[in-house]
């Protein structure tokens, strides 16, 4: 197996196959669920808006893949600093049956100098998730923070407040995941000594098998080849799947999606 094939197989099994579009429908989510089951293995999860969780749960069960996890988003995509709303949305997502919640950190508040509200928001959402055995991923929106010190600070605050994963991006802004921001965030995980309990998720802009290979190489360099499993590493993507399957000898690499 070539290096690209090996990394593509790893990446496929770490995917949060995503649709977060305004025109999402039950039919589109059902189609997404069908895509999670591939000839070379299943994706780790799907990531969808909360209202589609029940139909996704039913579809995954019917196709014989109930173990595929369902992630959803809250405080999304704006990352406002209203803790009550973020918490209410997170509780609603849990009530819908989410296995994982990807909450947007109040990154603009941090850029304006307020570190406390981010901590408090993540901590409140974490308490709700922990009580329901739901994983919490915190999206820090690196492409808006831009500055290395801010990316580092948002990562540190999220981890201190209880994040199970730190995630680069919503996929809804001009700049999403980059290898540079990924390295900064994973270095924070390493420097804080929390690699056993905190994972990393690049999202948005990871489109090709070669992209995925680059991101996995950074994780392998920092933590060794065994770290990036489904509890510690995810790719938030949709168009990536077709490219991975093509690298693995299935399909033509074409995808209808841009995430």
UniProtKB/Swiss-Prot annotation:
It catalyses: 2-deoxy-D-ribose 5-phosphate = D-glyceraldehyde 3-phosphate + acetaldehyde. The keyword Magnesium does not apply. The keyword Transmembrane helix does not apply. One of its GO terms (biological process) is 2-deoxyribose 1-phosphate catabolic process. GO terms for molecular function: deoxyribose-phosphate aldolase activity. The active site is at 102 (proton donor/acceptor), 167 (schiff-base intermediate with acetaldehyde), 201 (proton donor/acceptor). Pathway: Carbohydrate degradation; 2-deoxy-D-ribose 1-phosphate degradation; D-glyceraldehyde 3-phosphate and acetaldehyde from 2-deoxy-alpha-D-ribose 1-phosphate: step 2/2. InterPro entries: Aldolase_TIM (IPR013785), DeoC (IPR011343), DeoC/FbaB/LacD_aldolase (IPR002915), DeoC_typeII (IPR023649). GO terms for cellular component: cytoplasm. Keywords: Cytoplasm, Lyase, Schiff base. It is found in: Cytoplasm. Its EC number is 4.1.2.4. SUPFAM superfamilies: Aldolase. Catalyzes a reversible aldol reaction between acetaldehyde and D-glyceraldehyde 3-phosphate to generate 2-deoxy-D-ribose 5-phosphate. Belongs to the DeoC/FbaB aldolase family. DeoC type 2 subfamily. This is Deoxyribose-phosphate aldolase. The gene is deoC.
């Amino acid at each position: 197996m070539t290096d690209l094939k090996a990394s593509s197989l790893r990446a496929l099994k770490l995917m949060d196959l995503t649709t977060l579009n305004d025109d999402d429908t039950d039919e589109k989510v059902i189609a997404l669920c069908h895509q999670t089951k591939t000839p070379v293995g299943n994706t780790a999860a799907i990531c969808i808006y909360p209202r589609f969780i029940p139909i996704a749960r039913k579809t995954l069960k019917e196709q014989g893949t109930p173990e595929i996890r369902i992630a959803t988003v809250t405080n999304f995509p704006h990352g406002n600093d209203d803790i009550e709303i973020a918490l209410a949305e997170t509780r609603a997502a849990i009530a819908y049956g989410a296995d994982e919640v990807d909450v947007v950190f109040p990154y603009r508040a941090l850029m304006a100098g307020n570190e406390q509200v981010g901590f408090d928001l993540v901590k409140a959402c974490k308490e709700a998730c922990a009580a329901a055995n739901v994983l919490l991923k915190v999206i820090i929106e690196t492409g808006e923070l831009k500055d290395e010190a801010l990316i580092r600070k948002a990562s540190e605050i999220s981890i201190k407040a209880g994040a199970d994963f730190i995630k680069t991006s919503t996929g809804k802004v001009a700049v999403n995941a980059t290898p540079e921001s990924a390295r900064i965030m994973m270095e924070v995980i390493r420097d804080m000594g929390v690699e056993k309990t905190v994972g990393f998720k690049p999202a948005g802009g990871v489109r090709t098998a070669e992209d995925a290979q680059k991101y996995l190489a950074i994780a392998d360099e920092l933590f060794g080849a065994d770290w990036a499993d489904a509890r510690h590493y995810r790719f938030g993507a949709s168009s990536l799947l077709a490219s991975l399957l093509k690298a693995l000898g299935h399909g033509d690499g074409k995808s209808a999606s841009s995430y």
